[in-house]
Amino acid sequence: MAKKIIGYIKLQVPAGKANPSPPIGPALGQRGLNIMEFCKAFNAATQGLEPGMPIPVVITAYGDRTFTYITKTPPMTYFLKKAAGIGKGSTTPGKGSAGTVTMEQVRDIAEKKMPDLNSPTIEAAVQMVVGSARSMGLQVVE
């Protein structure tokens, strides 16, 4: 018989820096899960990644107070800001430009994000990345 799922917890946690302080502690504590067990497992799983990189994680909480988790690829905005060399996007997208990214960089980002995107082809994924770049106020150049 399968375990009873009592909920899903979606968080964005910096790679290798999971600790019991908010937002992780309260989110897991409400479901009665072992906070330190998650922190140790997550930090071990993200050890090889760039420290501080935001990693989306979906934690599945079960009725017997156990859990499983799935890590995803970092947000598209993280990759775009890194490629453009900026700290944050434009406050007025469409009017002011925050920076530029090349189509080669966009294609690179699309290939990294492909497992998490619901697009059938790389071309469709590239269009998603271009749309995100424009909404951040970044110009996409050839």
From Swiss-Prot:
SUPFAM superfamilies tied to this protein: Ribosomal L11/L12e N-terminal domain, Ribosomal protein L11, C-terminal domain
Post-translational modification: One or more lysine residues are methylated.
SMART domains: RL11
Subunit structure: Part of the ribosomal stalk of the 50S ribosomal subunit. Interacts with L10 and the large rRNA to form the base of the stalk. L10 forms an elongated spine to which L12 dimers bind in a sequential fashion forming a multimeric L10(L12)X complex.
Keyword Metal-binding: no
Main function: Forms part of the ribosomal stalk which helps the ribosome interact with GTP-bound translation factors.
Protein name (Swiss-Prot/TrEMBL): Large ribosomal subunit protein uL11
Taxonomic superkingdom: Bacteria
Keywords of the record: Methylation, Ribonucleoprotein, Ribosomal protein, RNA-binding, rRNA-binding
Similarity comment: Belongs to the universal ribosomal protein uL11 family.
MF GO annotations: large ribosomal subunit rRNA binding; structural constituent of ribosome
GO cellular component labels: cytosolic large ribosomal subunit
GO biological process: translation
